[in-house]
């Protein structure tokens, strides 16, 4: 991962690596024009967040072919710039962004929840702009199909893996997630897209196949010693806390900073 550091970008390109940047539009937009004029923006750039980015900045990203991930939960959770994820702005400028969970140490890597939060926040943003702010930009209602596409096809494209994953297409590897629509929280299901985006949870996943190999079946992960995995996690966390002199309090109202010497 590199920030707006052209020398690191050049090294990444020399090595054939994609360049992932934590990009905050309101803070960094002023640098885009110079980067674009120098030919330093391209399809190997992946910008995460893109919050509060002005229209001129979006046009530069689109023209340069920069790929974009938006982070519904993270942007709101941390109050990044205006706190609003940038999916609507990206779509308005002809960019199809992927969805990113961004920070699995703060909350679970749950793409079902990411889609739901995106749906709700986009609705709130639309109503706020139309009724409170007189916004010049009309917010079009997102459909569940669009959010599922952002979580699958567009996410694969952002990762540069669109030729091998993201959809069930001849020539791509067989990646499947089978959801048990007979589970009571999903039953009866009247619409596939709505069920996945609005109601499904990870507990509803019955089977997972990656590249044709079944890695989860009957709701159980295969080939993983869960007990040993938990032990390794506990050992790692204990080491980090002890090294930092941090004493966790499971009922604390907030994560307090470490004491300074």
Predicted regions and their residues:
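Active-site microenvironment of metallo-dependent hydrolases
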Residues: 146-261
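His/Asp/Glu-enriched, well-ordered alpha-helical/loop segment
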Residues: 38-40, 87-183, 199
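Alpha-helix N-cap/helix-start motif
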Residues: 28, 79-80, 108-111, 167, ...
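Histidine/acidic residue-rich metal-binding segments in metalloenzymes
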Residues: 1-70, 79-97, 113, 163
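Conserved active-site and cofactor/substrate-binding residues in soluble primary-metabolism enzymes
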Residues: 3, 7, 26, 30, ...
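Generic beta-strand/beta-sheet core signal
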Residues: 22, 48, 69-71, 100-102, ...
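Catalytic metal-binding/acid-base residues of hydrolase active sites
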Residues: 24-25, 52, 74, 104, ...
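Structural signal for hydrophobic packing residues in well-ordered secondary-structure cores
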Residues: 12-16, 39, 119-123, 159, ...
């Amino acid at each position: 991962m590199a920030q707006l550091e052209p020398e690191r970008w050049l090294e990444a390109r020399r090595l054939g690596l994609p360049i992932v940047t934590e990009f905050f539009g309101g803070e960094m937009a002023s640098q885009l024009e110079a980067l674009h004029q120098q030919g330093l923006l391209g399809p190997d750039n992946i910008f995460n967040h893109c919050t509060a980015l002005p229209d001129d900045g979006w046009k530069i990203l689109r023209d340069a072919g920069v790929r974009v991930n938006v982070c519904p939960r993270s942007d709101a959770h941390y109050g990044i710039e205006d706190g609003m994820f940038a999916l609507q702005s990206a779509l308005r400028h002809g960019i199809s962004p992927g969805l990113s969970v961004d920070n699995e140490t703060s909350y679970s890597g749950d793409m079902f929840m990411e889609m739901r939060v995106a749906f709700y926040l986009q609705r709130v943003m639309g109503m706020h702009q139309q009724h409170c702010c007189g916004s010049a930009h009309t917010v079009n209602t997102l459909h569940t199909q669009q959010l599922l596409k952002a979580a699958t096809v567009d996410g694969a494209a952002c990762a540069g893996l669109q030729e091998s994953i993201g959809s069930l297409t001849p020539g791509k590897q067989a990646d499947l997630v089978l959801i048990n629509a007979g589970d009571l929280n999903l039953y009866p299901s009247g619409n596939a897209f709505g069920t996945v985006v609005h109601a499904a949870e990870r507990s509803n996943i019955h089977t997972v196949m990656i590249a044709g190999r079944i890695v989860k079946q009957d709701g159980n992960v295969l080939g993983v010693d869960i007990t040993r995995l938990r032990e390794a996690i506990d050992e790692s966390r204990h080491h980090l806390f002890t090294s930092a002199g941090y004493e966790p309090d499971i009922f604390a109202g907030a994560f307090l900073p470490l004491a300074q010497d």
